[in-house]
């Protein structure tokens, strides 16, 4: 027996390979090896996006193959298991390289993002001069505002768009007026708390951002370091650079309006050199001021032409009593209106092509509240021609109800009835040649009368007209246009003086409301003769103005109260200077050169 056992033990290597013990042991090792390979295949399929590793030629898979000499090894089962399950990847990053495949694609998408500045030409114009931005305690918006167009975003990815403003350098500046340049004035002030303006449309998809112009027009700049409104805090007289940030959603965890913009692979920042600006509390460069007024649609109030007027014209615009309250129409105005109406064939710009008066055409001469005039004197009253007869011959049917009621009220006065005008016309001399009609614009309101003047000389053409005014109560005498000739320069220049009947030009009157009487005279060859002004202490405050061009004289009475009576309209003789006249100066006309005008009562 012992010999047999020794013989079995002493079997050769070839015989041992075919023994029962060897066959049973090799089957167990083969099954264990197959199970290990299947488990590794399943785990690698889950890690690799390209499919099963068996379909690829990745050399790493060769590390899973058993060693060629493994079948001949006689190691233990634990050694075989350790050898077969060990991963051939050298590091953890190599193992995760297959799973991190999309990361390079995301990084490449961030690199493809482009931001284009809108209104770049306007920014360049400001930059060439030296852009300035106003900052206030309450906050001031930027002009030009930052507007950008973004391209290259992933349409399905979510992004934040933000903006911040950072200092260009650590210097403080001052503006030198004689050279119109910004110069360094010292070191910058202490840093301000960081502020980030997150666009109100955030968070949005890349497709949404790319379909619109991203505007930061609601961003405000302030110098209040304690601001709690979310405005960007800046120091005055410092240079700053706006920046636009595109932040992917997965990198926005640290994004906050009161913290600096996070830095990482999912954040891309853009800036534009032409958007550098200097903060100020008031514009230093006048060129910047003018450019902002011209280009900023919200600065239209500063584009008023009156702001640019200087000298006497600005003073006259400021104080209305330096000039007449309204402008007298001239022949150029009628010509312009006629051209605007398409070259009407009538004799007047207020006449239609058939020669019929058009109240609507003359409505621009009157108040918008009641366009047609309240009342007109008939043509040739006081023997004054009215070539523009349509201005004098408007019928009652041509007026709106508001004008008709006023006309009826006017006609109720006996002094303004048709018979009164007939008497005025009958007392005048023969008709003279017609002249041009001038119609000033006045503001109509309630009509009242004027005080009754004293009796006038019998030869006065104004006697009848003065008599018609007796039915009106006391009011103010606002405008008086007076005229005289060289022969009567020493006589009373008063409008009711008898010497006016020998003058070569006539006074015509227009009764306006409130409580106004207007007289106009247009001498052909005016000249100015100065004499002292005489006023009575008990009478109304008087202001007389004479245009320097001498076209006509204007006298304006500004009463201190309605209780003042108009005794200044007193009779005077031809050889006595009136003591209650507006002004001793008068406009004379060369004898024989008559200039007339019609009467327009409103």
From Swiss-Prot:
BP GO annotations: embryonic cranial skeleton morphogenesis; embryonic skeletal system morphogenesis; negative regulation of transcription by RNA polymerase II; positive regulation of DNA-templated transcription
Chain positions covered by the region annotation Disordered: 43-95, 338-369, 425-444
DNA-binding residues (ranges): 122-304
Mutant phenotype after disruption: Mice show a general reduction of bone size and changes of bone shape. In the forelimb skeleton, the scapula lacks the central region of the blade. Cartilaginous templates are already reduced in size and show a transient delay in ossification in mutant embryos. Mice show a significantly reduced proliferation of prehypertrophic chondrocytes as well as of mesenchymal precursor cells.
Low complexity bias spans: 346-369
CDD domains listed in its UniProt record: T-box_TBX15-like
Record field: compositional bias (Polar residues): 71-94
Annotated source species: Mus musculus
Keywords from the UniProt entry: DNA-binding, Nucleus, Phosphoprotein, Transcription, Transcription regulation
Function: Probable transcriptional regulator involved in the development of the skeleton of the limb, vertebral column and head. Acts by controlling the number of mesenchymal precursor cells and chondrocytes.
Quaternary structure, from the entry: Can form a heterodimer with TBX18.
Modified residues (Phosphothreonine): 330
Protein name from the UniProt record: T-box transcription factor TBX15
Residues passing through the membrane, by range: none
SUPFAM superfamilies cross-referenced by the UniProt entry: p53-like transcription factors
GO cellular component, as recorded: nucleus; RNA polymerase II transcription repressor complex
Subcellular location: Nucleus
């Amino acid at each position: 027996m012992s010999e047999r056992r020794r013989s079995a033990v002493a079997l050769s290597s070839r015989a041992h390979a075919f023994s029962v013990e060897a066959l049973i042991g090799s089957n167990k090792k083969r099954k264990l090896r197959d199970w290990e390979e299947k488990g590794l295949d399943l785990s690698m399929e889950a890690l690799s996006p390209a499919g099963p590793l068996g379909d690829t030629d990745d050399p790493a898979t060769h590390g899973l193959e058993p060693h060629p000499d493994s079948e001949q090894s006689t190691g233990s089962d634990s050694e075989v298991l350790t050898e077969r399950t060990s991963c051939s990847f050298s590091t953890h990053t190599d193992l995760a390289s297959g799973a991190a495949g999309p990361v390079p694609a995301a990084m490449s998408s961030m690199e493809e993002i482009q931001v284009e500045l809108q209104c770049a030409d306007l920014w360049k114009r400001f930059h060439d001069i030296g852009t300035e931005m106003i900052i206030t305690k309450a906050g001031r918006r930027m002009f030009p505002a930052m507007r950008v167009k973004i391209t290259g975003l992933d349409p399905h990815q979510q992004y934040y768009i933000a903006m911040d403003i950072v200092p260009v350098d650590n210097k403080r500046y001052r503006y030198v007026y004689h050279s119109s340049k910004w110069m360094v004035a010292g070191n910058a002030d202490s840093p301000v708390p960081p502020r980030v303006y997150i666009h109100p449309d955030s968070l949005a998809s890349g497709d949404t951002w790319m379909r619109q112009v991203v505007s930061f027009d609601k961003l405000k700049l302030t110098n209040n370091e304690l601001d709690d409104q979310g405005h960007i805090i800046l120091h005055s007289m410092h240079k700053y650079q706006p920046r636009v940030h595109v932040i992917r959603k997965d990198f926005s965890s640290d994004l906050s309006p009161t913290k600096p913009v996070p830095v990482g692979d999912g954040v891309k920042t853009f800036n534009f050199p032409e958007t550098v600006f200097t903060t100020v509390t008031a514009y230093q460069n006048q060129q910047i001021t003018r450019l902002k007024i011209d280009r900023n649609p919200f600065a239209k109030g500063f584009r008023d032409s009156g702001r640019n007027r200087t000298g006497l014209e600005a003073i006259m615009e400021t104080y209305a009593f330096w000039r007449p309250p309204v402008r007298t129409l001239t022949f150029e105005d009628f010509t312009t209106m006629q051209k605007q109406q398409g070259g009407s064939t009538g004799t007047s710009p207020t006449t239609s092509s058939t020669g019929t008066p058009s109240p609507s055409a003359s409505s621009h001469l009157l108040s918008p509240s009641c366009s047609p005039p309240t009342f007109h004197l008939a043509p040739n009253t006081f023997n004054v021609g009215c070539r523009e007869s349509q201005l004098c011959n408007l019928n009652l049917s041509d007026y709106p109800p508001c004008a008709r009621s006023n006309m009826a009220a006017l006609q109720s006065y006996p002094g303004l009835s048709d018979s009164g005008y007939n008497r005025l016309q009958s007392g005048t001399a023969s008709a003279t040649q017609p002249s041009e009609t001038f119609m000033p614009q006045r503001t109509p309101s309630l009509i009242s009368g004027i005080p009754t003047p004293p009796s006038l000389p019998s030869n006065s053409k104004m006697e009848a007209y003065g008599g018609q005014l007796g039915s009106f109560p006391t009011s103010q005498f606002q405008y008086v246009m007076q005229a005289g000739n060289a022969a009567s320069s020493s006589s009373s220049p008063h409008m009711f003086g008898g010497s006016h009947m020998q003058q070569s030009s006539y006074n015509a009157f227009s009764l306006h409301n409130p409580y106004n009487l207007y007289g106009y005279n247009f001498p052909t060859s005016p000249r100015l003769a100065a004499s002292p002004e005489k006023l009575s202490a008990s009478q109304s405050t008087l202001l007389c103005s004479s245009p320097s061009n001498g076209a006509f004289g204007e006298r304006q009475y500004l009463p201190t109260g309605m209780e003042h009576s108009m005794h200044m309209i007193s009779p005077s003789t031809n050889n006595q200077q009136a003591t209650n006249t507006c002004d001793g100066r008068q406009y004379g006309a060369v004898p024989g050169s008559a200039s007339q005008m019609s009467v327009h009562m409103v």
